[in-house]
Amino acid sequence: MTNIRKTHPLIKIINHSFIDLPAPSNISAWWNFGSLLGICLIIQILTGLFLAMHYTSDTMTAFSSVTHICRDVNYGWLIRYMHANGASMFFICLFLHVGRGLYYGSYTYFETWNIGVILLFAVMATAFMGYVLPWGQMSFWGATVITNLLSAIPYIGTTLVEWIWGGFSVDKATLTRFFAFHFILPFIITALVMVHLLFLHETGSNNPSGLISDSDKIPFHPYYTIKDILGIILLILVLMILVLFSPDLLGDPDNYTPANPLNTPPHIKPEWYFLFAYAILRSIPNKLGGVLALVLSILILMLFPILHMSKQRSMMFRPLSQCMFWILVADLFTLTWIGGQPVEYPFIIIGQLASILYFMIILLILPTISLFENKLLKW
């Protein structure tokens, strides 16, 4: 009798995805982040579900319901801080996962890559709306500032913003709909993740060398299941250290003050994982230009398959491209730092230079260096 795992219509799909999946024999720890993102998503959905049981999406009670969760609900503080810091872990894994894709040329699987970029947008939207829900000062003003950016769209901008707000300012209607969207989006993300994996399994995984690995494949289980479990243990360890020792390390103290439309905080800034994009937005004096730059800073990822000029897929054997890649990473760290600083000299000019460098490296310098490296191959 054949094993049920290979014949049962449903178990067969799981088997081909996680057990008998042929995987390259040389994929490094950088390939762990896909499974870690899956774990992050599961943690976020579960903790979010339990938080939703006690949260009320009303402007009068939202802030106090979060206080109630932390004070009165059994282990409510743990669930709340796991959810808040879980989002940070999610984005750390996301950035490393995308960085891995850029370094090793995984973007040449362009269906998988483009769905990944859509996933990135969806996760960013979910995180933004989640940040609004506790209804603290930074929640309210962050929502006001970011939704207001849509008013830069010519002709329909103002109408669009008021339509999203459900009134003439961020109020009860906005909070209620943000809660509804924040609840539904993770399930849409889960569906997109399945499509992401579907396209990935059509081609098989890339590997550090960027070469075709069909001649040397190993089964996913037990080799990569055990490797993933190690990654998961480390992820949960880091998350729990963060949650139990310094849960507010990555948060904003202003969010412990209830939302007050009459009092603007001195420095409005988003969570740390949006600061690089926020810095790019602020570095352009024109409102519409800033919004376009903000969207393009993420959307530009979709251009990587077109901008790939090298004869080699991976950067493993391309030292000049490697050097430029790490300069890009340093530039993103600089942008993240600038995004958290006030708008004054010298931060304005540093932000503008870092923003120009970001787009120049991706659109001009990396493709040019790739062409130069192709020439070097002939020497």
Curated annotation (Swiss-Prot):
Residues that hold a ubiquinone according to the record: H201
Cited InterPro entries: Cyt_b/b6_C, Cyt_b/b6_C_sf, Cyt_b/b6_N, Cytb/b6-like_sf, Cytochrome_b, Cytochrome_b_C_euk/bac, Cytochrome_b_N_euk/bac, Di-haem_cyt_TM
Claim: Electron transport is one of the keywords in the record: yes
Keyword entries, A-Z: Electron transport, Heme, Iron, Membrane, Metal-binding, Mitochondrion, Mitochondrion inner membrane, Respiratory chain, Transmembrane, Transmembrane helix, Transport, Ubiquinone
Gene Ontology CC: one annotated term: mitochondrial inner membrane
GO terms assigned for molecular function: metal ion binding; ubiquinol-cytochrome-c reductase activity
Cofactor(s) of this protein: heme b
Binding site for heme b b562: H83, H182
Cofactor descriptive note: Binds 2 heme b groups non-covalently.
Cited PANTHER family: CYTOCHROME B
Remaining remarks: Heme 1 (or BL or b562) is low-potential and absorbs at about 562 nm, and heme 2 (or BH or b566) is high-potential and absorbs at about 566 nm.
Assembly behavior: The cytochrome bc1 complex contains 11 subunits: 3 respiratory subunits (MT-CYB, CYC1 and UQCRFS1), 2 core proteins (UQCRC1 and UQCRC2) and 6 low-molecular weight proteins (UQCRH/QCR6, UQCRB/QCR7, UQCRQ/QCR8, UQCR10/QCR9, UQCR11/QCR10 and a cleavage product of UQCRFS1). This cytochrome bc1 complex then forms a dimer.
Family: Belongs to the cytochrome b family.
Function: Component of the ubiquinol-cytochrome c reductase complex (complex III or cytochrome b-c1 complex) that is part of the mitochondrial respiratory chain. The b-c1 complex mediates electron transfer from ubiquinol to cytochrome c. Contributes to the generation of a proton gradient across the mitochondrial membrane that is then used for ATP synthesis.
Name of this protein: Cytochrome b
Organism (species): Tamias quadrivittatus
